[in-house]
């Protein structure tokens, strides 16, 4: 039943997306973009688009004033409502919201927001990712713009503050983050929003309890009070992965092994970073405007979300993306087929065939 509801919402959303550009010219550009970002296994490059020129797509992303903000709003509303539908008959279901920073590595000065952070040169994105059961969505993002701008911690809290009130009331929300977000300001901000958390901490993070020591001196599953955030008692999980030991704290006083299990949930976000960059084209961004970056990320999030809604164990990600495109955007498939026929006209003539087609009134 949940799959049926999710599929229905996805189809409604797909139709809403196609209607957002107001002119037929821009609608064709959007359809070509959807085909491009769902075509996994090939380079996400405007020269690969069908039905429109690379320059037309460049203007569509960088210049034209179509309402991409509305597209973001429609996508996020659909995502939250699909999560709500999935938890319809559950008592106080647990929703996990992961925040993390990833770098789309780039060089040069002509791309927007390129800076150096932690030794990496590129565009640094703080991403909010939602997970409930088998449902996994990238929801929203912020760009970290470097020194003297809002920190990743501040940007992450901004993203969490945008979670709708009706989601907060329906779900028990647990925020997952790595040690890059261990700052007291982040922990306090998460609790102020009414959320629980499991957050990584550095091995040398100091404590007031069980003494003035570091978390590395504290036992797995033990209780700790962090030195610069003594407001709450937390429980500690630790795991040795050979060359390095990792630590995390929980606001719910979970058992040590349960903390580690929650921490492993963050791999869903890590998987999105990998697939988003190398399958859905995030790493291939090369536009020179902030508007172009926002719309590029929008198409990545949209393609990933719709593909994951249709994914099954017996299909590869590439097969699922193509099936999703054809199921939700039949106009895009039709244009693709007509384009292929047009390209093969000369070949058909050489072999004595002539092919024509006409639109039927159904």
Which residues does each predicted region cover?
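Short secondary-structure boundary/capping segments within folded domains
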Residues: 22, 48-50, 86-89
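A common structural microfeature
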Residues: 33, 43, 54, 94-98, ...
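Short capping segments at the starts of secondary-structure elements
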Residues: 38-44
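Conserved glycine-centered beta->alpha loop in an early N-terminal alpha/beta scaffold
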Residues: 46, 52-53, 70-71
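Short, basic interhelical loop/turn and adjoining N-cap
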Residues: 49-62
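Active-site-proximal, Lys/Arg-enriched surface segment
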Residues: 63-133
């Amino acid at each position: 039943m949940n799959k049926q509801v999710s599929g229905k919402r996805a189809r409604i959303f797909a139709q809403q997306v196609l209607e957002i550009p107001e002119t037929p010219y821009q609608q064709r550009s959007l359809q070509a973009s959807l085909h491009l970002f769902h075509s996994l296994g090939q380079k996400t490059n405007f020269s690969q688009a069908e039905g429109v020129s690379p320059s037309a797509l460049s203007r569509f992303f960088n210049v034209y004033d179509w309402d991409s903000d509305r597209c973001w709003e429609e996508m996020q509303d659909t995502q939250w409502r699909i999560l709500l539908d999935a938890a319809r008959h559950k008592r106080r279901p647990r929703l996990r919201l992961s925040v993390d920073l990833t770098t789309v590595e780039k060089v040069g000065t002509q791309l927007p927001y390129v800076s150096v952070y932690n030794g990496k040169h590129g565009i640094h994105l703080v991403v909010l990712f939602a997970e409930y059961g088998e449902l996994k969505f990238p929801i929203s993002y912020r760009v970290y713009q470097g020194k003297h701008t809002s920190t990743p911690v501040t940007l992450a809290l901004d993203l969490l503050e945008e979670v709708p009130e009706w989601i907060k009331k329906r779900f028990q929300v647990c925020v997952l983050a790595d040690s890059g977000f261990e700052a007291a300001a982040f922990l306090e901000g998460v609790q102020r929003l009414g959320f629980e958390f499991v957050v990584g901490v550095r091995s040398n993070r100091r404590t007031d309890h069980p003494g003035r020591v570091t978390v590395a001196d504290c036992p797995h599953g033990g209780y700790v009070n962090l030195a610069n955030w003594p407001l709450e008692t937390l429980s500690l999980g630790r795991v040795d992965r050979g060359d390095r030991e990792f630590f995390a704290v929980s606001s719910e006083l979970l058992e040590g092994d349960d903390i580690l299990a929650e921490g492993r949930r963050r791999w869903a976000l890590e998987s999105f970073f990998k697939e988003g960059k190398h399958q859905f084209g995030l790493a291939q961004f090369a536009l020179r405007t902030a508007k172009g970056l926002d719309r590029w990320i929008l198409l990545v999030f949209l393609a990933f979300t719709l593909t994951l809604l249709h994914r099954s164990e017996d299909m590869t990600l590439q097969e699922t993306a193509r099936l999703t495109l054809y199921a939700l955007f039949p106009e895009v498939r039709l244009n693709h087929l007509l384009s292929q026929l047009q390209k093969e006209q000369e070949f058909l003539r050489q072999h004595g065939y002539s092919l024509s087609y006409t639109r039927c009134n159904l």
